[in-house]
């Protein structure tokens, strides 16, 4: 037996009270979702063979590479920030599957949010990460590891607007919220204790998440908080 829900949400701001088309401080833009992300666009990390080009922007290999939107040869908040995406997903889907075979029963509940952008505080407030905190696992750029994921660690680097650009990530995820396996004991086994039904079960909650984010639960919406608690429950239902 399968039950599912499917939700499409389309929202946009049609006008602002002051008659303008944008309110940057609140992140409101006419024609876009209420939960819109606006900032500099990270397009990678400057690599060794791009040293000359990086120098034109006052950068060097291993630092964050920002797209020069207006192609004026410099990066600044006034001219190079754009609408990057929205926290409103393209769709949300829930799927509840129940299977039964003889005395066994299995329930699997899955939840899927697709097409949302999150601002990960763990990345966006990256100064403590880029400064090489030894307690944090990060795929840093080095000459031997020319990744485009995270810049080189530097103790003195503090360009907040570029660090903030690290935080905008694809927040789509598929989560198996619950798996429950049960077994109903045969009547011949339980007759002596005068029970009409005994079912034993095991349930796992929030154990499996599939997303583009490492070591972070996207269900938390980007905030620096504990992930959803994983639970393993063993139980027994007895009817007399």
What annotation goes with each model-predicted range?
Residues 74-83, 88, 134-137, 159-167, ...:
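Extracytoplasmic loops and strand-loop junctions of Gram-negative outer membrane beta-barrel proteins
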Residues 6-12, 101-103, 112-116, 178, ...:
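Transmembrane beta-strands of outer-membrane beta-barrel pores
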């Amino acid at each position: 037996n399968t039950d599912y829900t499917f939700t499409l949400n389309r929202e946009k701001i049609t006008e602002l009270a002051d008659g303008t088309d944008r309110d940057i401080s609140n992140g409101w833009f006419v024609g876009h979702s209420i939960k819109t992300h606006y900032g500099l666009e990270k397009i990678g990390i400057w690599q060794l063979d791009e040293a000359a080009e990086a120098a034109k922007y006052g950068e060097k290999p291993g630092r964050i590479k920002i797209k020069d939107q207006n192609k004026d040869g410099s990066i600044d908040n006034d001219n190079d920030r754009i609408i990057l995406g929205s926290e409103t997903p393209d769709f949300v889907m829930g799927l509840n599957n129940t299977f039964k075979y003889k005395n066994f029963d299995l329930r699997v509940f899955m939840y899927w949010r697709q097409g949302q952008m999150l601002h990960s505080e763990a990345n966006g407030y990256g100064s403590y990460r880029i400064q090489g905190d030894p307690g944090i696992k990060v795929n840093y750029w080095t000459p031997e590891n020319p990744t485009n994921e995270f810049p080189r660690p530097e103790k003195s680097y503090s360009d907040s607007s570029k660090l903030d650009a690290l935080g905008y990530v694809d927040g789509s995820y598929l989560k198996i919220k619950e798996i429950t396996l049960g077994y109903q004991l045969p009547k011949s086994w339980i007759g002596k204790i005068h029970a009409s039904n005994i079912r034993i079960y095991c349930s796992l909650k929030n154990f499996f998440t599939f997303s583009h984010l490492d070591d972070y639960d996207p269900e938390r919406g980007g905030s620096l908080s504990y992930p959803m608690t994983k639970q393993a429950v063993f139980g027994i239902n007895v009817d007399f």
